[in-house]
């Protein structure tokens, strides 16, 4: 059974590229364009991993991360934060809120897929 990945980003081009990349890499993918949608999708889709952009309308990726980590039933969901903000303070904030990994944009496709596989315990 394919692992489930939820992509959360408000930029359509990034979502389309990530969706294509991850489906070709064997993942079942759903997308959300804002924080509220993301939380609904985590509830219904039950992803193994959330690929979470930091800067979004309504709720930031930080807010979404905090809310996911506040729910014991979602404790096993891995969170990989993506952001153009690569300053040490932003990375530290994401990790302290419970993100498993923080990757800065731009990133290589191979690096991203490798990071996802590692987080999901795949070879």
Predicted regions and their residues:
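Receiver (REC) domain active-site loop signature in two-component systems and cognate sites
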Residues: 56
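C-terminal output helix
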Residues: 107-117
């Amino acid at each position: 059974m394919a692992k489930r990945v939820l992509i959360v980003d408000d930029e359509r081009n990034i979502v389309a590229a990530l969706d294509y990349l991850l489906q070709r890499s064997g993942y079942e993918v759903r997308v959300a364009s804002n924080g509220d949608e993301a939380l609904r999708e985590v509830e219904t889709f039950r992803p193994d991993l959330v690929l979470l952009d930091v800067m979004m309308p309504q709720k930031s990726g930080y807010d979404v991360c905090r809310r996911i980590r506040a729910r014991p039933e979602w404790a096993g969901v891995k969170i990989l934060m993506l952001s153009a903000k690569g300053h040490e303070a932003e990375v530290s904030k994401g990790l302290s809120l419970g993100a498993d990994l923080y990757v800065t944009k731009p990133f290589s496709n191979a690096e991203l897929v490798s990071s996802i596989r590692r987080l999901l315990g795949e070879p």
